[in-house]
Amino acid sequence: MARNKRPEETANLILSVAFRLFMEKGYEHTSIQDIINQLGGLSKGAIYHHFKSKEDILEAVSDRMTAESNQMLAKIRDRSDLTGREKLKTIFKASINRPVQADIFTVAPDFHNNPKLLFSLLHDTIENAAPNYILPIMKQGIADGSIETDYPEQLAELVLLAANVWMNPMIFDSSEEESYRKFMVFGQMLRGFGLDILDGEMLERLKELASIYQKRK
């Protein structure tokens, strides 16, 4: 076990330094050499031993954030004091207000030039978040009468794809005004399923994140 500790520490150091630089300079404006310069004498070979490219480093940073998000989703999913609809509203509010969201929009990765990152987001949405966290809540909502749908699996995917992809200013390069319009359409769609779960506070936060991205890109 001791022999594996140092490589793990090195990888964690690389990720921590890279994330800080992504925050300070933005992903697109941070080079591998910038990361090396902040690693206290580690060589380029040390980085490439753990990560094949800057894109791989970004994916690893994103994986860290996904793990934290999954913990939050599981905690809300497993609560016994909320209806299905209340859980969905709690998830949306908690997700958009997480401090790490501002970090992500500050890093501002270019999804158009990083198709692997976009695929990773889509894959996690469809294969992980929708079936493991949102679908159980949909089924609970149907059972307790707070959600109206005959297609819980598809609705779980649709809701997350709209929230994580279609409304994501980093993917569609949306301005604050465009984000507002998408938010309103998303709210109308949700209300059609009896899900009046969006509010003005969430809208203002989305506009704030869009503004952070537009300033950083």
Predicted features, each with a name:
Residues K54, V61, M65, S69, ...:
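Hydrophobic/aromatic residues within well-ordered alpha-helical segments
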Residues A60, A74-F105, A156-V159:
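Hydrophobic alpha-helical connector segments
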Residues K139, A143-D144, F172-K217:
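C-terminal peripheral helix-coil segments that are non-catalytic and often amphipathic
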Residues L21-D56, A60:
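Helix-turn-helix
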Residues V100-S146:
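Short secondary-structure transition hinges
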Residues T10-A18, I35, V61-M65, S69:
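Generic hydrophobic, amphipathic alpha-helix propensity
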Residues L73, A129-V159, A163, M170-S174:
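Hydrophobic alpha-helical bundle segments that form small-molecule/ligand-binding pockets
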Residues L42, E68, R98-T106, G141, ...:
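A short secondary-structure junction motif
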